[in-house]
């Protein structure tokens, strides 16, 4: 039997036996594929011993599925992403469907009714919205459910873009020859808000590399690069940039997640330390510098804090 799992993570595929040892859950039988939207979760499943194939893609794989199991709920993903994935499952026409819903029965029924009440309707869940920095052109950016800050500008990202665009423009005004061509690395790029705003604000050519672990973010960033006419190399990665890109960037920008005790921020900043040239500048942003500043100082001893829009932009120079 061919089974597709949607919304499951590696911890959902194991249970503890009587001795407390981890073993695969008993229902993992047959030809099972687990779809993930994030390459980190894909790698976690691949490196486990559960015997499940992992696929990481922005959309569900098309096949003649005997069973599709979907795990979702308000604490697992946004309602819009749940509905988007449920619609994709409906369009796959699996022989059987099972929903594991972590939430109220009323919310479960409401989610299912959106498909059952109008089964022939195919919704477009993408969003297009404007963003700009002072003195820069207005960009129309596209995002998809699952992207960070889908349908709206993230204030922290906008604060970061405004500070970096302003500082780079001033630097080029006074020392343009030393900064040409300009190489920018945007890590955790999402749909590309920060990278594209900074690149579009500069008069001199910019080489833009963007990295994200989420396939829908990568899909959106590639689409926006093409639509905006801003050349960008967009990479799907949960471990920063490849070694051949070390010591090659003038500027690093990142808006690292605050959860997981800043472990993801460590990956961001370790990448920045590797990827920047000597004299390159690392910019990160957070709501409160108290948590991120000590992490950044582990990689860059000197940290300057620039306040913008109620956020703290942390600036460091690689020695």
What are these regions (language model features)?
Residues 1-50, 155-254:
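Conserved SAM/SAH cofactor-binding pocket of Class I
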Residues 57-60, 236-243, 310:
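Conserved SAM/SAH-binding loop
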Residues 67-79, 187-195, 249-261:
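Conserved proline-anchored active-site loop of SAM-dependent methyltransferases
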Residues 83-94, 266-278:
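A short glycine-rich, Lys/Arg-flanked "PGG" loop and its adjoining helix->strand segment in the class I
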Residues 93-97, 205-206, 280:
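A short helix->loop->beta-strand "cap" motif at the edges of active sites that frequently abuts
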Residues 105-129, 147, 288-319:
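Class I S-adenosyl-L-methionine
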């Amino acid at each position: 039997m061919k089974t597709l799992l949607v919304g499951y993570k590696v911890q959902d595929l194991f249970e503890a036996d009587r001795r407390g040892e981890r073993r695969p859950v008993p229902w993992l039988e047959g030809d099972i594929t687990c779809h993930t939207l994030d390459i980190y979760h894909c790698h976690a499943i691949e490196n486990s011993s559960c015997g499940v194939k992992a696929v990481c893609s922005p959309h569900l794989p098309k096949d003649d599925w005997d069973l599709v199991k979907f795990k979702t709920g308000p604490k697992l993903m946004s309602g819009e992403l749940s509905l988007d994935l449920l619609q994709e499952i409906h369009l796959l026409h699996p022989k059987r469907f099972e929903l594991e819903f972590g939430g109220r029965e009323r919310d479960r029924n409401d989610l299912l009714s959106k498909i059952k009440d109008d089964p022939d309707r195919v919704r477009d869940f993408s969003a297009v919205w404007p963003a700009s920095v002072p003195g820069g052109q207005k960009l129309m950016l596209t995002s998809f459910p699952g992207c960070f800050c889908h349908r709206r500008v993230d204030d922290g990202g906008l604060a970061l873009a405004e500070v970096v665009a302003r500082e780079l423009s001033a630097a080029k005004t006074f020392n343009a020859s030393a900064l040409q061509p300009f190489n920018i690395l945007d890590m955790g790029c999402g749909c590309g808000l920060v990278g594209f705003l900074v690149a579009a604000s500069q008069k001199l050519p910019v080489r833009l590399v963007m990295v994200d672990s989420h396939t829908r973010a990568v899909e959106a960033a590639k689409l926006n690069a093409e639509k905006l006419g801003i050349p960008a190399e967009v990479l799907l990665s949960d471990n920063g940039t490849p070694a051949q890109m070390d010591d090659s960037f003038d500027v690093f920008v990142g808006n690292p997640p605050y959860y997981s005790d800043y472990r993801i921020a460590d990956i961001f900043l370790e990448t920045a330390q590797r990827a920047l040239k000597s004299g390159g500048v690392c910019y990160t942003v957070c709501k409160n510098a108290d948590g991120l500043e000590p992490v950044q100082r582990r990689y860059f001893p000197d940290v300057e804090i620039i306040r913008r829009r109620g956020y703290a932009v942390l600036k460091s120079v690689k020695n």
